[in-house]
Each structure stands twice: as structure tokens, then as C-alpha cells.
Amino acid sequence: MVKIECDIPNSSQRAELLKHTSLIIWDEITMMNKHNLQAVDSVLRKIKQTDVPFGGIIFVGAGDFRQIPPIVRNGTREEIILSSIKFSPLWRSFQILDLIIPVRQQHDKEFAELVDKISNGTLETNEDGKVILELIKTTTDSDEWTRFVYPDIPHVDPSTKAKALLTLFNKEVDKQNENICDVLTGEYKTLYSHDELNESSDISEFFKDNITTEFFNQINFPNVPPHELKLKVGMECYIVRNLSPEEGILNNTQVKVIHTLKNLLHLRHLENGKIFFIPRITFSMVLKRKGIKLNRKQFPIRAGYVKTFNRSQGATLDRTGPDLRTECFCHGQLAVAISRVRTREDVLILTTQDKLDVYNRAITTNVVYAELLL
């Protein structure tokens, strides 16, 4: 049984803040594993010294169960479903308030209806069980796809503000980001991480003595910067960890590289224009099958021109391009990828010729787990 503990000492400043808290709002809560929610509930009961849900604090969770669920690494359909807060004992304590007006697509009703059908799993399928995406433009040309979202490449460095190309896998994100960054003006500066074995690794002494730094350097983990972080001045990136909530420097914050120093990055916040510095921080990675725990000290940013479907969840974009050459494999992925924009004119699907019908409409897989819908 999985158990996550949230250890906040009763005498700490954070506990004191929570003692006087009357409202907590948790956005995109449907992406959160139920064990995280239960850990928060447990610590709030302890701090408030009461046995009522969330210590009696009004708790508002915002999210959409039709979108991407919690990530369960190598999880089965059943494991993913059971990880949802909908299957937590706390679920019975919530009052459900439905939002029935499509705010994002309110000016394109046909597109809003298509998004709803995709999200609910009610879009008609063909004899192969695939959906046909009417209304949405398609291309099989990756250059056209890139220029749709970033039309000024290569003459002007593109802006990522309210724009993104979307793909399913981190490897493809890295590849497509590199393709775009290669044509940006300026020279690359490569910043190397410091990788070392965590002493709590469950491996033999022989393996500890013979494992090499080069082995560590080759390891790539989702949402962890690579050993070789290649940056250019003017390049737009996003932060991958919460660094300073007070300053608005959070996970997914979009930034522009102003200058690179040996131990600091000089960045500009794309939303508010503020300039700030960030240091390297330590990331912990676990290779479960090998019992290896790795610490990587690296700057917490990644190139931001291309993102995964998962990372785009919650964002409203002016223009986007979902890559459907590889088909969706989990609940809510297609709904998230298509629904980031306001109108059908703001999205262009990249696909392959064999995934188009005679009218050039995309044919693809839409995965919806009925158990997760309200």
C-alpha cells in the first residue's frame, strides 16, 4: 500500500500559517494522485487538531476528470483509474459544482461541441474504432507545422508566449526543440551537470566501485534537465521546479535567457518582465529496476518551444500544433491537446498520410476511461 507523508512540524512557520488558513484552492487537482491529497488531509488534521476533512479548512479543487489523470509509471488502466482522487475515501466529502459554459471556446460553438465529444468519448468512431477529427486543419509537413505556430522562424527568434507545439513523448520534445533552437540566432553555450550516486542506492559494493560518471551522464528523466544543457541568449525556456512562489518563479513559468554564467542563469520572466537569477539545484532520480539513486545538480530549465501534452494541461494558448503521428494511449490526452486554443483556426494537427481520410481529416485514437468521468 502506498503511503505519502507530509511532514510539517507543528512549531514551524508553515504550520502557523496553515493554522490561520480558512481557504485552500488546488488547481488541476484531477491530475493529482489520491495519495498526495490524503497526505495533505492528514497533515491539516494534525495541525488543526481536529479529525474532520482537511482540518475543517474550506478546500476547493479545480479540474476536469475528462483530461489527463495522475501519472502511474508503467501502470495498467486499473492502476491509473484507482490512483485518481475520485477513488479516495475523501471523495465523499466533496460537493461537485459543474461548470457547464465552455469559456475557452465560447466564440466557436462547433469547435466547443467537438471538444466536448472528444472529452466525453462520444465522438463517433469508424469501423476501426478511430475518431475522425472534423473542423481541424491537418498537415503532413513538419516545417509547415512549425511555421504555423512560429511563423517568423528563421528570420526572427520566435516567442513562446501563449504558443506551443505539442507531442506525446519527452524524446520527441527534445528532438523538436533542438530543431528549432538550431536555427535561432547566436551560439550555443553548453552547461554541464554534476552527477553522482546517492549513497542510499540499493546496489552492491562492486557495482558502486565500478559505476562510471559517463553512465550517469547518459541518463535522462522526465522533467529533469539533461547532463548537457545547451542554451542560447534569447532562447525561451520554462522552469521545471517551484523556485520562488513569492516572486512567481514556479514550475512551467516561461522565461527568456539573458545571460549565462558558470553558476547562475540570468533570465527574464515572460509574463511580468522581471529579471532574475537562478542557481543550479539538485534533482533526485531513481532507476527502480537497478536500485540506483542518482543526484544531478543542474539548472532547472528546459527549452520551451515544444512541450508534452501533459505539460500543456491547464494552459490557454493562442496557437498550437498537436503531433498525432503517434496516437494517444491514455485517457484525456487527445482532449487536452485539441482544447488548448479558443477556435478551430488556432490549431494545426501534424499527422501522416496513412492517418488521413479522403477529405484530409485526421484519423486517430481517442482514449477515454468511463470510470473517471463524472
Show which residues each predicted segment covers.
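RecA-like helicase/translocase P-loop NTPase motor core
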Residues: 1-374
